[in-house]
Structure formats: structure tokens, C-alpha cells
């Protein structure tokens, strides 16, 4: 019984926290959003897009706006 409880405790401790791999996957998603914005000749802006630009999407971290010049 002690062995079973010990194995269960070890298993819970191993899977109870975010591993570094999960952090890396979040970073990849952030990079993909930013690269998507720059691919369409946009730029990330902290708040609303400035007047000569338009909102075309979002840059993932902090939900920033992806802005592009109107042409």
C-alpha cells in the first residue's frame, strides 16, 4: 500500500506544474502572430492604430493591435 501511495504521489508531483516545454509552445504561438503581422507589411502597436493606418489583426502578447498603412 505504501508503494502504491508513493507512486501516486510522485505521479501527481510530476504532472502538477507547467513544464518548460509548455512555455516554449506559448512562445512559438506568440512568434507566429508577430511574424504574420509583419508578413502583411504591418506593425504591432500597443493601443489603437494611429490615424493613417488600419487595424488588420492582432499581435498575440498583451493582445496588441496589428496595424497596416492604408494604400
From Swiss-Prot:
<keyword id="KW-0044">Antibiotic</keyword>
<keyword id="KW-0964">Secreted</keyword>
<protein>
    <recommendedName>
        <fullName>Beta-defensin 10</fullName>
    </recommendedName>
</protein>
<keyword id="KW-0929">Antimicrobial</keyword>
<feature type="signal peptide">
    <location>
        <begin position="1"/>
        <end position="23"/>
    </location>
</feature>
<dbReference type="GO" id="GO:0002227">
    <property type="term" value="P:innate immune response in mucosa"/>
</dbReference>
<feature type="disulfide bond">
    <location>
        <begin position="37"/>
        <end position="66"/>
    </location>
</feature>
<dbReference type="Pfam" id="PF00711">
    <property type="entry name" value="Defensin_beta"/>
</dbReference>
<keyword id="KW-0732">Signal</keyword>
<dbReference type="GO" id="GO:0005615">
    <property type="term" value="C:extracellular space"/>
</dbReference>
<keyword id="KW-0211">Defensin</keyword>
<dbReference type="GO" id="GO:0050829">
    <property type="term" value="P:defense response to Gram-negative bacterium"/>
</dbReference>
<dbReference type="GO" id="GO:0050830">
    <property type="term" value="P:defense response to Gram-positive bacterium"/>
</dbReference>
<dbReference type="GO" id="GO:0031731">
    <property type="term" value="F:CCR6 chemokine receptor binding"/>
</dbReference>
<comment type="similarity">
    <text>Belongs to the beta-defensin family.</text>
</comment>
<dbReference type="InterPro" id="IPR001855">
    <property type="entry name" value="Defensin_beta-like"/>
</dbReference>
<feature type="disulfide bond">
    <location>
        <begin position="49"/>
        <end position="67"/>
    </location>
</feature>
<feature type="disulfide bond">
    <location>
        <begin position="44"/>
        <end position="59"/>
    </location>
</feature>
<comment type="function">
    <text>Has antibacterial activity.</text>
</comment>
<keyword id="KW-1015">Disulfide bond</keyword>
